[in-house]
């Protein structure tokens, strides 16, 4: 599977996610970066869909943490290259 890397980050509510493209699947996808012990992914057929799914994933993560009485972790970009 050929993958193309794009040097761009999405940002929302203190969370950051990468953007990747799969030409085989013809879909944009990514995951929230620098979030300890937590995996959040998202995808879309366009940049608008990708960004909306990213926002929805972050909102769902925060809501789940609140329901469980936990403080949501934030992305840490202090040493991100």
Where would I find each of the regions flagged by the language model?
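Short beta-strand motif preference
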Residues: 28-31
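Short, charged, surface-exposed hinge/linker loops at domain edges
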Residues: 1-18, 25, 38, 48, ...
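Short glycine-enriched loop/turn motifs at secondary-structure junctions
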Residues: 33-37
């Amino acid at each position: 599977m050929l993958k193309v890397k794009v040097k761009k980050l999405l940002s929302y509510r203190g969370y950051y996610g990468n953007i990747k493209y799969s030409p085989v699947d013809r879909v944009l996808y990514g995951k929230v970066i620098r979030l300890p012990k937590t995996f959040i992914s998202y995808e879309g057929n366009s940049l608008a869909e990708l960004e909306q799914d990213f926002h929805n994933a972050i909102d769902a993560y925060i809501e789940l943490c609140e329901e469980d009485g936990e403080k949501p972790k934030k992305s840490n970009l202090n040493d991100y290259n």
